[in-house]
A protein has these predicted regions:
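Hydrophobic transmembrane alpha-helices and their immediate loop junctions
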Residues: 1-186
Length: 186
C-alpha cells in the first residue's frame, strides 16, 4: 500500500477544519469502500499488486487485465458496501451521520463518469451488450454529458447561494474524465 504526501496533507487539512467530527467517518467509509473492492477481487482470485491512495482518490494496481464480468463485479463491490452500511447505520441510534456519509459516497461513486465505479460499471455493461468499441464510445459520451450537467448545476448553485463545492467536484471530475480518456488512448 502506498499513501501519497498529497493525501496526508489533504487529510490533515480536512481534519483540522472538521468541527462536526465527520471526517473520521468519511475516512472510514472510504476505507471500507476500497476494502469492498479488494475483497471482491480476492474472492475472484485476482492478485492485487498495490493500493495507492492519493489526494484525488484510490487506485488499485492489478497484475493483469480483468475481464468485463470480473471488473463489473469488482466495481460494484465498493458502492455496495457503502449502501449496505448506510441502510444498517440508519437503524442504529446515533448512526444517522455515518449512514449519510456512506449513502453519499456510495451514490457518488455510482455516477456514470470515467474512473468512478459507475463509469466502470457502465463501460463493462455496454461492452458486454454492444461490444467494447461502441461501449467505450457511449460510456465516454455519457461521462462528458454527466460532467457537463454537474458543472452547470455547480455554476447554478454557486450563483444562487455562493457555495462552490459542487462546481469544484465537477471540475475535478472533468479532469478525471480527461485523464481517463488519455490513458485509454481516446
Amino acid at each position: 500500500m502506498e499513501v501519497s504526501a498529497g493525501f496526508l496533507l489533504l487529510a490533515a487539512w480536512l481534519n483540522y477544519w472538521d468541527r462536526q467530527g465527520v471526517f473520521p467517518r468519511v475516512l472510514l467509509a472510504c476505507t471500507l469502500h476500497e476494502l469492498g473492492h479488494l475483497l471482491a477481487l480476492r474472492w475472484m482470485g485476482v492478485p492485487v499488486e498495490k493500493l495507492r491512495v492519493t489526494a484525488v482518490g484510490a487506485e488499485l494496481r492489478l497484475s493483469g487485465a480483468l475481464g468485463y464480468r470480473t471488473e463489473l463485479a469488482a466495481a460494484m463491490a465498493g458502492p455496495a458496501v457503502n449502501l449496505v452500511l448506510a441502510g444498517w447505520l440508519s437503524h442504529i441510534p446515533g448512526g444517522v451521520v455515518g449512514a449519510g456519509v456512506n449513502l453519499v459516497l456510495g451514490l457518488f461513486n455510482l455516477l456514470p463518469i470515467g474512473r468512478l465505479d459507475g463509469g466502470r460499471i457502465l463501460s463493462c455493461v455496454l461492452a458486454l451488450a454492444i461490444g467494447p468499441e461502441y461501449g467505450e464510445r457511449v460510456a465516454a459520451l455519457l461521462s462528458v454529458l454527466c460532467v457537463a450537467l454537474l458543472s452547470a448545476a455547480g455554476i447554478w448553485v454557486l450563483w444562487l447561494g455562493g457555495n462552490g463545492s459542487l462546481l469544484m467536484v465537477s471540475l475535478w471530475l472533468a479532469v478525471s474524465v480527461s485523464e481517463f480518456g488519455r490513458k485509454r488512448g481516446k
